[in-house]
Amino acid sequence: MAREVLSGVLVEVLDSQVAAAAAGKKMNEVINAAKNVMGGVHFFVIVDTLKYLVNGGRVPKVAGWAESLLNIKPIIMLKNGEAHSVARARTYLSAVKQIMELSKNRIVKGLPLHVAVIHAAETEKAEELKNRIASSFDCAELMITDFTPVIGAHTGPGVIGLAFYCGE
């Protein structure tokens, strides 16, 4: 849309903000920096309930019914815009331990670690996860933020995520 309205102007859509822009870099340098970061981002999400994903048609009713009956917390990895189920846990704390372990296995030693804890109406759990991350990893950057309303509408309240990348 912006490309159509602003013909003759370079318009590049990015899913993240970039520190390079604040550093006064040229547009192509900002775009390259953002693309480099996006390719290295690891993103794990703990879904509290599949109810909202079932209602939205993203998960079959049978799967949602079985997992809710057993109170299973699915762990989803988002990579390159696609969601993949990577684990399941019986409790929230078990799910947290699993995403911490999954993250630990992907952290590149010697590079700065940038981490975001992302949540939908779970401020307390987000703080607890942030504290656990801070005590387990040497983070160059560690923040808490909210999921967008669009994600919250699909997953419902209670979803919590951990996103990170290693690098400058």
Language model region names:
Residues 4-168:
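Mixed-charge interfacial surface used for oligomerization/domain docking
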